[in-house]
Amino acid sequence: MNKLTIATRKSKLAQTQTEIIMKSLKDKFNIDSEKMLIVTEGDRKLDVSLAKIGGKGLFVKDIEIALLEKRADGAVHSMKDVPYELSHEFEIAAITEREDIRDVLISKDNIPFKELRKGAIIGTSSIRRACQLKLMRNDLDIVPIRGNVQTRLEKMKEQNLDGIILASAGLKRLNEEDIITEYFDPKVFIPAVAQGALGIECLKTSSAKKYFEKMEDSNAKLTVEAERSFMRMLNGDCHSLIGAYSEIQGNDLYMIGIYDIGGRIVKKDILGDKNDHIELGRKLANKILEI
C-alpha cells in the first residue's frame, strides 16, 4: 500500500497522538504515513465555551470533510471529543490502548489540592470538572480556560491562577507528567467519557480500514463503548455534566457514572459481565435516572 495520510488537529498533543498511531502502522505493517494538519472550528473559537458553540463535535467535523473528500485515509481523535452519533459514512475502526484516565491538578508552587488557599482560583472550562471541584471544595473560584495544553499553562501564569485541571493522558503523551501536582482518584473525581482513549476514524469503504482494525485494544474498546453507551442513553454532550469511569475486573466490568439531574448531581456505579458492556452502560444510565 502507498503512504497513508492521517488527518489530525494542529495542536502539539494532537500531532503527538497521531505520531503514536503512525509509528504503530510502521511497526506492525511496515506502512509509511504522513500527517494532514487541520484547524477545526473548535480550535478557531477559543474565546467561547464549547457548550455555547455546539459541543465537542466541532473538533471532528472539519476532519471528517477531509475523509469524505478522500484527501485523508484516516483520522486520529481523542475519543472524548467524538460525538456518539457518527454520520453513516464513517466508523471508528479502532480504539487503541488507553492512556491514564485520570484528571490532574497542576498548581502554582506545586501545592496539593487540600492545601490550596481558601478561595483559590482554578482554571477549567469543563462543566464536569468545575462542578466536581465545587463539591470537593465549595470555596474555590472556578474560571474558564480553553486552549491546548501549552496555552492553558501560559494562561495559568498570565492570569495568576492557583491551578488548572487537565487530563493526565495528554501530559503523559507529551512527556510533561513532571509538572503534575496531584492525580485525582477516578472513582471520586469522575473523568470524561472515553478520557485517555484514541480512536481511528475512517470511511466505512476505506481500503486502509483493515489495517486500522488490527490496531484495536480489546479492553479499551470494552470500556470506551460502555462509557459511550452510558452517555448515549443520557443524551449527554458538553452541555451536560456527565462523566464515567470503567475498568475491567477479571470477567466483569465495573463502571461509575455522574450526571446532573435538575441541578442535583447523581453518582452511581454498576458491576456486570464485561461481554454485556453496552447494556451495562444503559443500565447505569437508567439507575441514575431512577433517582
Swiss-Prot record:
Looking up PROSITE patterns in the UniProt record yields: PORPHOBILINOGEN_DEAM
The UniProt note on the cofactor reads as follows: Binds 1 dipyrromethane group covalently.
Query: Which reaction is the catalytic activity of this chain?
Result: 4 porphobilinogen + H2O = hydroxymethylbilane + 4 NH4(+)
Query: What pathway annotation does it carry?
Result: Porphyrin-containing compound metabolism; protoporphyrin-IX biosynthesis; coproporphyrinogen-III from 5-aminolevulinate: step 2/4
Q: What else is known?
A: The porphobilinogen subunits are added to the dipyrromethane group.
Q: What does this protein do?
A: Tetrapolymerization of the monopyrrole PBG into the hydroxymethylbilane pre-uroporphyrinogen in several discrete steps.
Name recorded for this polypeptide: Porphobilinogen deaminase
The record's gene field reads hemC
